[in-house]
Amino acid sequence: MKAGVPWLLHLYQSWNDCVDRLILRSFAKVNIGLKILKRRPDGYHNIHTIFQEVDFHDNIYLALQDDGCSLAVDKSGIPKDGTNSCVVAYKMIKNHFPEIGGISIRMEKMIPHGSGLGGGSSNAATVLKGLNKMYNLGIENKILETISAEIGADVPFFIRGGTQVGDGVGNELGPAELVNGTYLLIIPDILINTKWAYGKIKNHLNCSDQRPNFASFLKEGNLSFKFIQNDFEKIVIPAYPEIGRIKDRLSDMGATFTSLSGSGSTVFGIFDEEADAKSAKSCFQSQHQTVLTLPTNLEI
């Protein structure tokens, strides 16, 4: 569970010790720094990042059904077929546990598609955790992380949550200190294709195997953001200048750190003072979707 922001909103227990229905929060993330390292033999790039979960979320309603997976989404533009990460998550569990029945999934989407906030990966992880609970499968989180990595590189992070160092393709996780502050997310109406971003990155960066250590700059009492950068900004900002302008304005308004999240398009600022973040929000909200939120932490 999350401290202060319950992962599980409602739970209904049935007579046979399975859970009939769940209502779950599916949280977003931001990347505090993202270093692109050398390309791997499998075609993917190794990365180094800090994943920080934030209290901005979709709501996912799960209900048992006899067989199969049905999906309803309240927003257009989200696939509702077998390519949706939630359906993939169900099929993954069904492959490992063929005796389970079906699931009905209804999503209230708040996290925009293609925003760099990990909405699809978070949804998949939430469904995996929900199925584990509803069917009383008893899968340990470490095993669930391994299963989830077959869906997407950052799905394991959403199984674990909180603040994590991400290595490998983002699936190798280790704990990091919570990055406190008030987070202001600015989500412009820009869709950035991740494949496009990675395709461009090889022509703009001298990718190496030299791994930084972002977590060392974020330790309590030694907080320093000046060496933490997102490599995607080098290609995204020239292609989408509005993103650079948002970053500059957030800095001018008092954010201690500003960055693109993932490959975009969300830009976020971390503010020491909530009042400053609220003031900045009022300046952006007529032009872009804005979200004022807080980081979430794992319950000790």
Where do the protein language model's features map onto the residues?
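Residue-level signal for inorganic ion chemistry
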Residues: I32, I60, C86, G120, ...
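Glycine/serine-rich anion-binding loops at beta->alpha junctions
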Residues: P79, R106-Y135, A153, A255-F271
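ATP-binding N-lobe of GHMP and related small-molecule kinases
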Residues: V5-W7, W15-S115, K133-K142, V169, ...
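Contiguous, small/hydrophobic- and glycine-enriched helical/loop subdomains that border
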Residues: A124, L128-V165
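Generic non-transmembrane alpha-helical segments
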Residues: A89-H96, I143, I147-E150, I235, ...
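Conserved, helical-rich catalytic subdomain that frames metal- and/or nucleotide-binding sites
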Residues: L71, F158-R160, Q164-F257, D272-A275, ...
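Short, basic/glycine-rich phosphate-binding loops at helix/coil junctions
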Residues: D66-D74, P79, V127, A149, ...
